[in-house]
Amino acid sequence: MSQKHRILLLNGPNLNLLGKREPGIYGSKTLDEIVADLTHNADELGVTLEHLQSNAEHELVGRIHQAMGQVDFIIINPAAFTHTSVAIRDALLGVAIPFIEVHLSNVHAREPFRHHSYLSDVAKGVICGLGADGYQFALTAAVHQLRAA
């Protein structure tokens, strides 16, 4: 039997407040609920899902580094770090693990400073504006790409 593919889910700053923080923009589901649903679907798809949420850029960078040789795909919602973090971009490029960038809200329909991403041009894909479903779509796409490789 072949080894299960491993997918790393990373969530950036303030996503620990999902369900409480601006539900009109980010929805009413908590991050724990989103991760539980995603973990269940990952199990059904026959892949392993690991998760880290951090409000600290260096913790996300460190986990990306640890993923090298251990993880097959990354799904990342960098949150506010989308618009500021060259460090996360460089870490993702450095480990050369394919990734999909996810945003709950449509960042292009919001304030102008949210329109730029340091990650989008090096991501396999970007999903935004579809709420918590965006994570499910990213998981399905990641599994599809891993199986096609």
UniProtKB/Swiss-Prot annotation:
- KW Lyase (keyword) present: yes
- Pfam families this protein is in? DHquinase_II
Tree of life domain: Bacteria
Listed name of the protein: 3-dehydroquinate dehydratase
Catalytic activity reads: 3-dehydroquinate = 3-dehydroshikimate + H2O
The Gene Ontology biological process terms listed for this entry are:
amino acid biosynthetic process; aromatic amino acid family biosynthetic process; chorismate biosynthetic process; quinate catabolic process
Native source species: Aeromonas hydrophila subsp. hydrophila (strain ATCC 7966 / DSM 30187 / BCRC 13018 / CCUG 14551 / JCM 1027 / KCTC 2358 / NCIMB 9240 / NCTC 8049)
Q: What is said about its interaction partners and assembly?
A: Homododecamer.
Keywords attached to this entry = Amino-acid biosynthesis, Aromatic amino acid biosynthesis, Lyase
Extract the NCBIfam families matched here: aroQ (TIGR01088), PRK05395.1-1 (NF003804), PRK05395.1-2 (NF003805), PRK05395.1-3 (NF003806), PRK05395.1-4 (NF003807)
Q: Which GO terms describe its molecular function?
A: 3-dehydroquinate dehydratase activity
